[in-house]
Structures are given as structure tokens and as C-alpha cells.
């Protein structure tokens, strides 16, 4: 039984495990998976304001996606799982601090930047993409949610003149092609003595060949999220030092 979209992004179910019989468990599981309840389960310390913002994400993207295709129609059916929760996987690896400035490269419609900005309201997020219509959606969603810590810019990462404490991204391209885009974009002085400035990159699959000589810290997301979607999903952490010292070989297109 697959619920209609109106049901998927309608009022959020108060609980997904309230009845035990098979049919209602199926319906309750779908409700849980397709709404912000999925986020509330994994991040129980959310404030009422943050919960409201996460609840509004689904309808906002459903509305914008009808005008500008920033997320595949198929993926909208599992929006909170494949886009919101996946983005928040970075938060299972690192808690951004108040005052830090984070760059989201190739943000598309706002991922992972928008969900992270909701979770860390005292951290500044600069979301960039080379496609202007996607940034239009980013800024509209941020404004609708009252996210004053988000700025979206229609620009390529290579063209940026600023430096950041962290860079985040989600499977934009081959890692060894990505690294040259962000060289020089990380501040030399660490904001957090416990975690050197660097890149937090969401990526799936076998990364041994792709990472090559890069000394990366890999965190498997299936230790936090049980859905099979996360079976091969990871957060790749690279320090600024590792990024600055990397010389990319030629990568096939």
C-alpha cells in the first residue's frame, strides 16, 4: 500500500508504532518513513521551531518541484529519507559550532545545506551551485522557513574568494575531481581545536579507488540509520592539510 502524495506530505502522524496488526503497521511505517517523524526519531532533541521547519520542508519542496525540477519525481516519494535524513548524516559525524561558516558546494536544491542549517541555527551556511534556478529554490525555501543563517549564490566553487571553516557536499562528482575545486577555500586557522577544518562529503559505494592516496576518515551511516538505503552510504572527512597537499591525476570524464 503506497499512500498518495497528499497523504505523504499532509499532517504528520503522531506516532508510527501505535497499532500492532500487520496492515496498520504497514501504514504506520509508511507514515513514519515519508514524513518528518523520521527526522524526529533520529534527532530527539529538536526544538518545537526546528520540528516545524522540518515538517514544512516536504510541502515546500513538493510545491517548488512542480515548478522547477530540483528533485526527481521518484525521489520525492522518499524525500525525508533520501534527502533530509541523508543530509543530516553529516551531523552524526560532527556538530557544527555557533559562529562557524560552512560552504555547501553543488547544493542543487539545498542539500545537505538546508537540513543542516535547520539543525544548526547558529552556524552560517553558504550554499552554491552553477545552476541559477536551483539557487532560486534554495533562497525561496530558506526565506519561507525563516532561515537567516542561509545564503544561496549562483556561482561555481572555483570562483569563490572567501574561506570557510568546513565544506560539505553530497556526491557531486568524483572525489579527485572535486578536491581541486575547493583548494584554498578552507581557512588555515581551525575554529575548533578538536576537529581541524576540512571537508565532510556524503558518498556511497566502494571508495578505495576513488579516494586513491587521500587519507580520509570514513564513517558508515548504516551504524546510525537502519534503512537499506544507507547500507553503503558514508561521510568522508578530509582535513584542510590533506586537501591542500593533494595533486589530482587526470580523471576520465
Task: Give the ranges of each region predicted by the language model.
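Conserved beta-strand signature within the Rossmann-like core of class I S-adenosyl-L-methionine
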Residues: 192-206
Amino acid at each position: 500500500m503506497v499512500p498518495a502524495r497528499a497523504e505523504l506530505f499532509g499532517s504528520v502522524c503522531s506516532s508510527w508504532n501505535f497499532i500492532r496488526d500487520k496492515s496498520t503497521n504497514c501504514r504506520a511505517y509508511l507514515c513514519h518513513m515519508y514524513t518528518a517523524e523520521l527526522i524526529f526519531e533520529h534527532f530527539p532533541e529538536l526544538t518545537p521551531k526546528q520540528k516545524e521547519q522540518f515538517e514544512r520542508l516536504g510541502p515546500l519542496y513538493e510545491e517548488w518541484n512542480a515548478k522547477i525540477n530540483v528533485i526527481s519525481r521518484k525521489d520525492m516519494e522518499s524525500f525525508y529519507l533520501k534527502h533530509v535524513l541523508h543530509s543530516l548524516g553529516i551531523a552524526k559525524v560532527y556538530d557544527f559550532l555557533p559562529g562557524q561558516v560552512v560552504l555547501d558546494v553543488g547544493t542543487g536544491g539545498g542539500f545537505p545545506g538546508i537540513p543542516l542549517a535547520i539543525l544548526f541555527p547558529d552556524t552560517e551556511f553558504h550554499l552554491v551551485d552553477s545552476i541559477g534556478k536551483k539557487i532560486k529554490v534554495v533562497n525561496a525555501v530558506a526565506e519561507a522557513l525563516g532561515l537567516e543563517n542561509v545564503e544561496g549564490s549562483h556561482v561555481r566553487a572555483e570562483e569563490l574568494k572567501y574561506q570557510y571553516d568546513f565544506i560539505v557536499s553530497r556526491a557531486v562528482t568524483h572525489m579527485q575531481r572535486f578536491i581541486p575545486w575547493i583548494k584554498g577555500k578552507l581557512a588555515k586557522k581551525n575554529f575548533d581545536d578538536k576537529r581541524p577544518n576540512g571537508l565532510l562529503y556524503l558518498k556511497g559505494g566502494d571508495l578505495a579507488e576513488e579516494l586513491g592516496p587521500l587519507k580520509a576518515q570514513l564513517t558508515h551511516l548504516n551504524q546510525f540509520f537502519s534503512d537499506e538505503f544507507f547500507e553503503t552510504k558514508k561521510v568522508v572527512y578530509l582535513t584542510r592539510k590533506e586537501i591542500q597537499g593533494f595533486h589530482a591525476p587526470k580523471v576520465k570524464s
